[in-house]
A protein has these predicted regions:
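ATP-dependent adenylation/nucleotidyltransferase module used to activate substrates
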Residues: 1-194, 324, 331-333, 341-343
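AMP-forming adenylation/ATP pyrophosphatase catalytic core
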Residues: 151-343
């Protein structure tokens, strides 16, 4: 009995990566999938914070279960962060280093392929779907830089790309692959209906914080104020929590937006000052940096602004660190003051 070739797939949990698995299998290969945890995924963030108002799921696990594919989760967050801070190919519209990200993941998939004796790597990329990383010239450059020339199958667009080694040697039936291109999703959605795939996440990069303008602004703020040299994965994670306010180059505050974020901030405060309103329901805030003089009142006024006492003439805010507590009475901040300091 002839042994089927083995393909290593990158499974994000999105529509295209899900389809790439099924199409590759139908074209004659066994598949094994990898899902990389980078620290910048929205669904992973919601799970860690404890969000209950949004669906919390790892779509890659759901898709793998639905299509019957083996899946290995790989934490690459510590290696991934330095690449994000200094991408060789630069950023997209926000802080998203899409080309460098692709090369990063494909190199690790190549290493896995070589360790396991697999025949090729495959992805759900579609020609022309993304303006920077999925035009034909970029696809070729990424494949070369990742060390996968001739061994990277893109089954959804294979018919409009040069045949890979697996196709040329008959390991994969090229006639069972597709020639999708462009930003339209209808062909993929129709194909998903045909295969009965329903567990995939929504398209358009919605899982990556780095494509989000608000998150990217906070990321740039940390880098601008000297944080890149000592930035950790946990620091990056906190950028997705709460409202962030800058008071000086060395002082900022994070104010929770809901009960889950308040609980999370209270847990992560550690050696930082935390703050909350006295006598009213309100947010938990964590202060990063040392508070000086007028900073107490300014921070307290913003915390008060987001409390149930925001319409009072003045309210008390309590700051706590370890066994030390300090109370400050202040008027809630004006909208203009909030706008000046919000990152």
């Amino acid at each position: 009995m002839k042994t089927r070739p083995l393909g290593i797939g990158l499974l994000s949990g999105g529509l295209d990566s899900a389809l790439s698995c099924v199409v590759t299998r139908e074209a004659g290969a066994d598949i094994r999938c990898l899902h990389f945890f980078t620290g910048f995924c929205v669904t992973g963030h919601n799970s860690r914070v404890g969000r209950t108002d949004r669906p919390i799921a790892n779509h890659a696990l759901q898709v793998a279960a639905e299509i019957g594919a083996s899946l290995e989760l790989v934490d690459v967050s510590e290696e991934y962060l330095p690449m994000v801070l200094k991408p060789k190919h630069g950023y997209g519209r926000n802080m998203n280093p899409c080309i460098d990200c692709r090369v990063f993941m494909l190199r690790r998939a190549r290493d896995y392929m070589e360790r396991t004796g697999a025949d090729f790597v495959f992805t759900g990329e579609v020609v022309g779907q993304r303006p920077k990383s999925q035009v034909k010239t970029a696809l070729r450059a990424i494949e070369k830089e990742a060390g996968l020339e001739g061994r990277l199958l893109r089954p959804l667009s294979a018919r409009i790309l040069p045949p890979t080694v697996a196709e040329r040697t008959g390991l994969i039936d090229r006639e069972k692959l597709h020639g999708f291109s462009g930003r339209g999703r209808k062909p993929q959605i129709d194909l998903a209906h045909r295969y009965g795939i329903t567990a995939y996440s929504q398209p358009a990069g919605g899982c990556c914080f780095l494509t989000d303008s608000s998150y990217s602004t906070k990321f740039k703020d940390v880098i601008a104020h000297g944080g890149s040299g000592s930035l950790s994965v946990d620091d990056v994670f906190v950028l997705g929590v709460g409202r962030h306010f800058r008071f000086s180059p060395v002082l900022k505050a994070i104010v929770g937006r809901n009960a889950e974020e308040n609980d999370f901030l209270a847990r992560m405060a550690g050696d930082h000052w935390s703050a909350g309103v006295v006598g009213f329901n309100g947010p938990t805030a964590v202060v990063v940096g040392e508070i000086r003089d007028d900073d107490w009142v300014e921070i307290a006024s913003i915390v008060a602004r987001y409390s149930d006492g925001k319409n009072k003439e003045s309210i008390e805010v309590e700051f706590v660190r370890g066994g030390t507590a300090k109370r400050v009475r202040t008027a809630p901040a004006s909208a203009d003051f909030v706008a000046i300091h919000r990152i």
